[in-house]
Structure formats: structure tokens, C-alpha cells
A protein has these predicted regions:
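Intrinsically disordered, low-structural-confidence terminal and linker regions
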Residues: 1-29
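Extended, charged low-complexity segments
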Residues: 6, 12, 272-301
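Short, conserved beta-strand element in jelly-roll/cupin
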Residues: 161-177, 181, 259
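Short beta-strand His + acidic residue motifs that chelate non-heme Fe in jelly-roll/DSBH
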Residues: 177-178, 237, 243-249
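Short acidic-glycine-tyrosine-enriched beta hairpin
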Residues: 181-239
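A short hydrophobic beta-strand segment most commonly corresponding to one strand
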Residues: 251-268
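Conserved short histidine dyad/triad with adjacent acidic residue
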Residues: 102-104, 137-160, 183-184, 239
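A short, N-terminal "cap"/entry segment at the start of jelly-roll beta-barrel domains
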Residues: 56-139
């Protein structure tokens, strides 16, 4: 059972673009307009129960609309639990998000290898302002993804910070999160600050090519904690705070729902890497069908 029992029409309207933006651009030609869907689902009412919405998604022959509804209900549950500090039933939300991905052709799902070596699938992106910024993704770690990336580069540039407050809920597996501090006034620096520059012409929701560019600021790193998180647990990262994540669940998968929000303040995003490197291009494999990974995760739940 989810905490969210109903969705009102204004919330639905506000969520339309952030949900649609999480799909590949071709999805725009498949999904009906906001006005059409609003009329179809609400039919003059101000609210609709999540049970009614899910029942509609189960019964309609329009798979693109079904995918949208499953994703909407799942994402709204994540946001509600985050903002109200409620326990997130990750299995319930997983079922909705998994359906949302499975029911449409894989080419309509944006999926790419993130800088930390996981498969990243956007689910919701609201980016009208920094203060109201909200970005939710599904992250999947699995050793089958190793062939799509340069593992040394992933390791070299895996310590990073975020502009926004981040929270990660573990769906399955065993996720590690190490935290770091640094000092720049040191004679024993081993690392440097890097700026990540994205190829602006590429997909704005999941970039798949970027450069880590040396900023001429050297630093000494200190690991301050090592954490391990399991299914039904979560961890949080404050803006500007350094961390490094990964998974410890081989040969099985690990998966998380990961969110950024601007409501907790704005920080600075940067990457720490070996100081002997001046510039490094990071290519991320795009359009990896996630279905086999969804199947694998289902067997773990």
C-alpha cells in the first residue's frame, strides 16, 4: 500500500511535463496532450484515487498512457515520502516503475551508463528553477554493464559532489557510500578538482558524453566514513559534500531510486580526480535495454 491515496488535477497538470521529459523524445508523438489525458482521466472531477488510476492503466489498450500513469503514481509516492519523511515501500514503487518501463518499446526509455558505473534511467525532471528543481532516477548496478565503460576512468572520477540535496532508497542489493572531506592547503596533495563539461547538443535528461577538465586546484582527500546500505534502507548527501557510491552485491544486481531536490538548498557540483590528469573524456553508452536487468531484480525481490 502506498501513502499517496489520491492525485488532484492541479498536481497531475504540474507533473505532466516532468514525467514526459523522462522519456525519449519520440515518446512525445505517442502520448496524448495534457488536455486530452486530463479530460479522459478526471472527466470533470478534481481528484482521482491512485487505485482508480492504476486500474485504468491496467485496463486501457494505450500502453503509452499506461506507462505514464504507472510512472506518475510511483514518482509521486517517492516525492511524498521524501518531503514528509515517511518510509518508502520500495517494492510497491518498483512494481509501478518496472511496469512503466516494460510496457513500452525499449527505445522510448532513456538509459545510459552513469559516471559511477550504474545504469541510469530518468523518471521525472522538473527544472523550471534551481529552487524547485526535482530529478528522480532509477539506478541499477550490475557486472554485465562493465563492458560498456572504462572502469579505470569510472574509478578515477568517482568521488564527487552534487549541486542539490540527494537521497537514495535501496530497492535491492548492497550499496556502499563513502564520504570524504578535503583540504587545499597541504604539501601532500594527491588529487585535484575537475569540472565536468557536458556535450550540450546531447540529450538533456541523461547526458552520455562529458569531459572532466582540470581546474588547477590541488587537494588532499580524507575518507570520513564508509557506509553499507541494504534493501529498504536509504542514505542522503548534502549539497557540495563529497561522496563515492558503488555496490557490493556481485554477482547479483543492486538498484536504487535516486532523487535530487533544490528545496534543501543549492551547493556546488565538482569531481575529484588524480592530479596528474589534465583532461579526460568520459563516454557513456546510451540506449541499453534494461529489461534483462528488471527481470534479474524481480528474482531478487
Amino acid at each position: 500500500m502506498t501513502h499517496i491515496q489520491k492525485i488532484d488535477i492541479s498536481d497531475f497538470c504540474d507533473s505532466y511535463n516532468p514525467i514526459v521529459k523522462s522519456y525519449a523524445t519520440e515518446y512525445l508523438s505517442k502520448i496524448d496532450s495534457l488536455e486530452s489525458i486530463k479530460t479522459l482521466l478526471f472527466n470533470g472531477l478534481n481528484t482521482k484515487s491512485t487505485i482508480e488510476l492504476i486500474d485504468f492503466a491496467d485496463e486501457t489498450t494505450d500502453n503509452y498512457l499506461s506507462s505514464f500513469i504507472y510512472r506518475l503514481v510511483g514518482v509521486k509516492e517517492i516525492i511524498f515520502c521524501r518531503e514528509n519523511k515517511k518510509h518508502l515501500n520500495t517494492n510497491e514503487v518498483w512494481r509501478l516503475i518496472s511496469k512503466s518501463i516494460r510496457i513500452i518499446p525499449s527505445e522510448l526509455t532513456i538509459s545510459s551508463i552513469g559516471s559511477q558505473g550504474f545504469l541510469s534511467i530518468p523518471l521525472y525532471k522538473k527544472d523550471l528553477s534551481l529552487e524547485t528543481f526535482d530529478f528522480i532516477r532509477l539506478h541499477i548496478w550490475d557486472d554485465s554493464l562493465d563492458k560498456f565503460m572504462d572502469l579505470k576512468k569510472c574509478q578515477d572520477f568517482s568521488i564527487h559532489s552534487h549541486t542539490f540535496f540527494a537521497k537514495s532508497w535501496i530497492i535491492t542489493g548492497k550499496v556502499k557510500n563513502d564520504r570524504y572531506e578535503y583540504e587545499t592547503e597541504s604539501d601532500f596533495t594527491t588529487h585535484s578538482f575537475f569540472e565536468v563539461q557536458y556535450n550540450k547538443s546531447l540529450n538533456e535528461v541523461n547526458q552520455h558524453s562529458s569531459k572532466a577538465v582540470y581546474k588547477n586546484i590541488n587537494a588532499r582527500l580524507f575518507k570520513t566514513s564508509e557506509e553499507v546500505h541494504f534493501a529498504k534502507g536509504y542514505y542522503e548527501i548534502e549539497p557540495s559534500k563529497l561522496h563515492q557510491s558503488g555496490h557490493l552485491n556481485l554477482p547479483n544486481s543492486s538498484a536504487t531510486f535516486f532523487s535530487f531536490t533544490g528545496k534543501e538548498g543549492i551547493g556546488e557540483s565538482f569531481v575529484i580526480g588524480p592530479k596528474e590528469i589534465v583532461e579526460s573524456e568520459i563516454n557513456r553508452k546510451m540506449n541499453i535495454s534494461p529489461i534483462y536487468l528488471l527481470d534479474k531484480i524481480d528474482t531478487q525481490l
